[in-house]
């Protein structure tokens, strides 16, 4: 059992506030609550020790308590230095679940907390990872690589964050007995990954033959990527910009870099707020989609002096460069809704004059006197400056996460060290669990109709290659 103080939160006194909001969120998360009812008696996660690295929000608290209700033992950190909701972390800590998460952590604290995920409270090790962005997974892979003798990369960090991360790995190698990372890698039975960026890392490891354990790509479940990424961003992006700046959105020109699911939701969010929206894309298919939706598709170079608001949603690096920001209007708003902070060249701004306006809102002045307003230092604006996606859409994502954890834990040995997705039948089940809450009446196929299109009356209703 965890000790009484096996947590780090800003203020444990916020637990009651957090508990009240968790109770409200539960009524908006029908998928997770249905999973609790279905599986509580059978305890499919009994024996699972889940190391969770995912934004420590109110919605995540409902996920954590669902995993616990299904029998799991849990330790948790946030996957972003600004995304923690302190009252949510306090409520989870007060419930006896070890959590290490504070809004506004330093990068050093962030990685120290990540290391605590793997120092289990019974002296053992976790045997499952639930990840968002892949940092917990990378901790195991980088540590084992260095432990096996290939440690040269630790002396070649490519960023401030890598410098801190690699220093942590070096410290762990000194503090832990030889073979600790090997034992950790062997202990982990699988990982379920939440987001596009983390999934990209997993597929890269798998292609190189370096993935240490089976992985389920939760992001590409239809009920995650086509709902959380699209409809979640449609609501939460503008919320973050408004809370950060109080700016009038209507009439402004907004530039969205990237028109994947997150970019589509972001562009819709800005359009619905009255913005005139520009989009940049490298993919001709996505560019054509944006144009057919009525957006002007152009380049960042063209948009830099024109737009009032800039949003990156690409999953790539250096999308907004220092030169782009030099060309922007005075007090243009710059933010990111992709997982990592390197979509905007924030490092190139460090030698300029910074004025902090309020938490996660900075004004940066260039040599010519013009300024930009940077939100959340280029990290996730919807979680850094607001409260993230609404509970209902996160219920679908987190129901997928729970089902993925059950699948990996209860079917050890079934999966190779590759990346898998959940079957379509489970995707449809997740969707079905959310229909009653919003008053949907589903049509039932007759036997002759099902036979005519070659499907079962009860689904799956689409082939695996179908694109929603």
Curated annotation (Swiss-Prot):
Keyword Secreted in annotation: no
Keyword Cytoplasm: yes
Catalytic reaction annotation: S-adenosyl-L-homocysteine + H2O = L-homocysteine + adenosine
MF terms in GO: adenosylhomocysteinase activity
Subcellular location: Cytoplasm
Signal peptide feature range: none
Positions that bind substrate: 57, 132, 194, 224, 228
SMART domains with a match to the protein in the record: AdoHcyase (SM00996), AdoHcyase_NAD (SM00997)
Cofactor(s) needed for function: NAD(+)
Gene Ontology terms describing biological process: L-homocysteine biosynthetic process; one-carbon metabolic process; S-adenosylmethionine cycle
Keywords: Cytoplasm, Hydrolase, NAD, One-carbon metabolism
Annotated pathway: Amino-acid biosynthesis; L-homocysteine biosynthesis; L-homocysteine from S-adenosyl-L-homocysteine: step 1/1
Gene3D superfamilies per UniProt: Adenosylhomocysteinase-like (3.40.50.1480), NAD(P)-binding Rossmann-like Domain (3.40.50.720)
Free-text remark on how the cofactor is bound: Binds 1 NAD(+) per subunit.
Binding positions (NAD(+)): 195-197, 229, 258-263, 281, 316, 337-339, 382
A Pfam cross-reference name: AdoHcyase_NAD
EC number: 3.13.2.1
GO cellular component: cytosol
Family to which this protein belongs: Belongs to the adenosylhomocysteinase family.
Role noted for this protein: May play a key role in the regulation of the intracellular concentration of adenosylhomocysteine.
Name of protein: Adenosylhomocysteinase
Organism: Methylobacterium nodulans (strain LMG 21967 / CNCM I-2342 / ORS 2060)
């Amino acid at each position: 059992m965890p000790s009484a103080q096996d947590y780090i939160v800003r203020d444990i006194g916020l637990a009651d506030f957090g508990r009240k909001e968790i109770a409200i969120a539960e009524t908006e998360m029908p998928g997770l609550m249905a999973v609790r009812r279905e599986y509580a008696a059978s305890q499919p996660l009994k024996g699972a020790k889940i190391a969770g690295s995912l934004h420590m929000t109110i919605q995540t608290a409902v996920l954590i308590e669902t995993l616990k209700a299904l029998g799991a033992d849990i330790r948790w950190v946030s996957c972003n230095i600004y995304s923690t909701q302190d009252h949510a972390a306090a409520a989870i800590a007060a419930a006896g679940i070890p959590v290490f998460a504070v809004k506004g952590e330093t990068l050093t604290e962030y990685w120290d907390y990540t290391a605590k995920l793997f120092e289990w409270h019974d002296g053992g090790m976790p045997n499952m990872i639930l990840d968002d962005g892949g940092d917990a997974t990378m901790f195991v892979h980088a540590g084992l690589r260095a432990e096996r003798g290939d440690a040269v990369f630790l002396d070649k960090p490519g960023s401030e964050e890598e410098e801190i991360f690699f220093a942590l790995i070096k410290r762990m190698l000194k503090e832990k007995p030889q073979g600790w990372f090997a034992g950790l890698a062997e202990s982990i039975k699988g990982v379920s990954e939440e987001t596009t960026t983390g999934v990209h890392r997993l597929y890269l490891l798998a292609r190189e033959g370096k993935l240490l354990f089976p992985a389920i790509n939760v992001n590409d479940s239809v009920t995650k990527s086509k709902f959380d990424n699209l409809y979640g961003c449609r609501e939460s992006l503008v919320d973050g910009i408004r809370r950060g700046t109080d700016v009038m959105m209507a009439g402004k020109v907004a530039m969205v870099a990237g028109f994947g699911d997150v970019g589509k939701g972001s562009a819709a969010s800005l359009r619905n707020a009255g913005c005139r929206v520009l989009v940049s894309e490298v993919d001709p298919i996505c560019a054509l989609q944006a144009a057919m939706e009525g957006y002007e598709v152009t380049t960042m170079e063209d948009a830099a002096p024109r737009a009032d608001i800039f949003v990156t949603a690409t999953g790539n690096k250096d999308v907004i460069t220092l030169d782009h920001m030099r060309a922007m209007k005075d007090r243009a708003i710059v933010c990111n809704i992709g997982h990592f902070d390197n979509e905007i060249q924030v490092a190139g701004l460090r030698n300029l004059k910074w004025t902090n306006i309020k938490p996660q809102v900075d004004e940066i002045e260039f040599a010519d006197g013009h300024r930009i307003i940077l939100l959340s230092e280029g990290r996730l604006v919807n979680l850094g400056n607001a409260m993230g996606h609404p509970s209902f859409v996160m219920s679908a994502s987190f129901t997928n996460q729970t089902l993925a954890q059950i699948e990996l834990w209860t079917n050890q040995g079934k999966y190779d060290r590759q990346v898998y997705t959940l079957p379509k039948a489970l995707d449809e089940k997740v969707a079905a669990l959310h229909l009653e809450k919003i008053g949907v009446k589903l049509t039932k196929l007759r036997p002759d109709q099902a036979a005519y299109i070659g499907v079962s009356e009860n689904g799956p209703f689409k082939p695996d290659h179908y694109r929603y």
